[in-house]
Structure formats: C-alpha cells, structure tokens
C-alpha cells in the first residue's frame, strides 16, 4: 500500500534521473521557455534544485524584478522604523531575522505594545514563492501585502506617501534608490518593491533534506528517512503541505496557494475545547466554505518558528502532531461543518510521530540569512 511505499527512494533513484532526462531532451530539441513565464524553472535538473522555481513569476513586471541593488535597499528599509507612523516599528520588529523572521510569540503586540493582534507572525522564508499573502490570502503579491501592513493602524500606522518625503531628505537613501531604480523617482510602489525584493531573496531551499535528495546520502539518518515516508504516506501531511516548498503552493504548476479548514482550538484547554473564533478567509470572501479557512504555511524551518497555527495555540511540534493525529477539530469535538482536514484519526504511534518530527527538523536552512547579516 502507499503507506508502506518508499517515496524517498522513488524520488532520488527514479524521479530525479527521469526529470533530468526530460530537461536535457528539451534543451537538445531547442525548445526555449523564457524566464518569468512559468513558476517552474525548466532549466533546473530536479524539482528539488535550489532554483527549481522562478521567483520572477511571483513578481510584478520585469522592470521590477529582483536585483542586488534592490535587495540591499530593501534590507535597509526592512529594519528601519522610518515607515511607521511614530517611527518606532520596522518590519524586523515582528519578523526578526534571528528567529527565522518570526517573533517567538503566539500573537504579536500592536503598535501600542499593549493590544495583542489576532494572528501569529509567519516566517518570511520562501514567502515570495506563493500567490497569496496573509493567513487569509487577502493579498496577491508581496507589494500589496506590504502596503496593507504599513497602513494598518494597529501594526505600523504609517503612510507610504508620507514616507516618500522622509526618504527623499535622506542622502544615503537617495543614493540607494538612484542605484536600484535609476529611471524612477522615489514613490510608493518602489518602496514596497524594494522591501519585497529583499523578502524574495530569502530563499530557504538548501536544508539537509534538500542535500540528501540531490544525492548526498549522508545527510539523513534512518529515523528521518522513515519520517519523510510517513509524511508523504500514512500521516497525509503532503496532501496539504506540498513538496518541494512544503506549503500550500499546489503542484504541478504552483500557481495557486491552498487554504484549509482544520478546526483549530482557541486555547489548549480541552475541558471543553473551543473553536477559535477567527473566521479567516471568510472575512474577505463571504462564502460558507471559507469559514475558519487559513492558508497552508510552509514547514520549512518549522523547528525555529514556534508557536504554531494561525493563532499560536500550540507551543511544540508534539502538540501539533497530536492535534492532527486525532483528526483536528473533529478529535476535539469542535469541528466546523466545512472542515477540510479528514475527520478520521491517523493512528500514528508515538514512534512514528517522533520520526515525522525528526524529518521536519531536516527542513531547517538559514544560510540565506547568514549570508545577508
């Protein structure tokens, strides 16, 4: 059965060689696919290569694609409170590089440092490789997501329009903008594009798992290998967390990003458990199927991004696995009618859960940050 299928060996010994052969055949046939026209980089020799997906596909038109100058400018803006209304908060206040671009809190504080916001801070690693931003998928590209955060009264209470004037007065910023955008004066969009370019540079696709699947068989131990096969099979994790990004970007084209209804509890209290009252995607798309629906986040760097779920309700991966093993909200008797997570229990043993967690920890890769900071 598929539960016993050795998916890892199948990928390394059969899928990768076949994929490489297909790429070479296309090249030999003289078939050219221009960059940016597809999410898939058809020059990559494996679906697990670092450049297997094209970041430009998820970007604005070509004149706003990522360049080294824009990354440098975006990195400076990312850590500068100049965009916030009271000049005390930057993007890095919540998306902290040393915490895999999260903040380690169940939910972040608002600008007043007293009010608690409604959702957990997600990692920014690989955030550029998706067509939906925010847990409720209300923004499409990073530029639009960034504008919402800057203008949100509780988050930054700023104004990109007002920031233009501030940035024009700064000699260093003027130089950086001239190098990054030599044909345009400083404006709202290129501020957002610069920060988005920096975020698009935050690739995390060279973890131990990736190195193993590209041929370095020393990178995974027996428990981690078993964990991957369980992840793909019996545990059904990969039916929502699609490879190679391990998020909701749907193969084979990776042009849509899925959301799921899990029945996440409001707190860890089980006597009785309460369904979290955040309606998720339904707040923006008034269809009952989207009630309590949230975007499937990436599992890459998962060991660094606790606490978990859209509301930060679970502190450990063990708690997360227990929730899924029992059928999500159904197992807590709080499942909404539209729960998309299968109601049946997974019947994973404690050993199997440990193996899955061991595998997930092989998805840790912060080399991009080390190179930037």
PLM features: what roles do these ranges have?
Residues 13, 119, 186, 190, ...:
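Aromatic- and histidine-enriched alpha-helix N-cap/loop-to-helix transition segments
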């Amino acid at each position: 059965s598929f539960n016993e299928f050795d998916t890892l060996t199948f990928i390394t010994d059969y899928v990768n060689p076949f994929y490489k052969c297909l790429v070479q055949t296309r090249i030999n046939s003289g078939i050219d696919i221009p960059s940016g026209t597809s999410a898939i980089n058809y020059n990559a020799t494996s679906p697990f290569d670092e450049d297997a997906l094209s970041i430009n596909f998820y970007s604005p038109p070509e004149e706003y694609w990522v360049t080294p100058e824009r990354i440098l400018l975006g990195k400076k803006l990312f850590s500068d409170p100049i965009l916030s209304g009271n000049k005390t908060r930057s993007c890095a206040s919540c998306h902290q590089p040393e915490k895999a671009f999260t903040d380690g809190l169940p939910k972040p504080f608002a600008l007043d440092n007293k009010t608690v916001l409604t959702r957990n801070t997600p990692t920014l690693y690989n955030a550029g490789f998706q067509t939906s931003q925010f847990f409720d998928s209300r923004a499409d590209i990073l530029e639009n997501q960034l504008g919402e955060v800057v203008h949100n009264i509780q988050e930054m209470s700023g104004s990109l329009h007002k920031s233009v004037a501030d940035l024009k007065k700064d000699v260093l910023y003027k130089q950086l903008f001239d190098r990054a955008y030599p044909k345009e004066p400083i404006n709202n969009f290129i501020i957002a594009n610069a920060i988005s370019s920096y975020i698009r540079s935050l690739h995390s696709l060279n973890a131990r798992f990736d190195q193993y699947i590209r041929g370095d068989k020393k990178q995974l131990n027996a428990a981690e290998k078993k964990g991957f096969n369980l992840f793909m099979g019996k545990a059904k994790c990969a039916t929502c967390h699609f490879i190679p990004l391990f998020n909701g970007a749907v193969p084979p084209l990776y042009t849509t990003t899925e959301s799921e209804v899990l029945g996440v509890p409001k707190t860890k209290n089980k006597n009785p458990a309460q369904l979290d009252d955040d309606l998720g995607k339904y707040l923006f798309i008034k269809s009952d199927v989207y009630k309590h629906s949230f975007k499937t986040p990436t599992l890459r760097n998962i060991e660094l991004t606790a606490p978990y779920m859209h509301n930060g309700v679970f502190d450990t991966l063990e708690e997360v696995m227990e929730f899924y093993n029992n059928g999500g909200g159904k197992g807590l008797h709080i499942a909404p009618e539209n729960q998309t997570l299968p109601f049946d229990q997974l019947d994973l043993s404690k050993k199997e859960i440990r193996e899955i967690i061991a595998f997930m920890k092989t998805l840790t890769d912060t080399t991009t940050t080390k190179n930037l900071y």
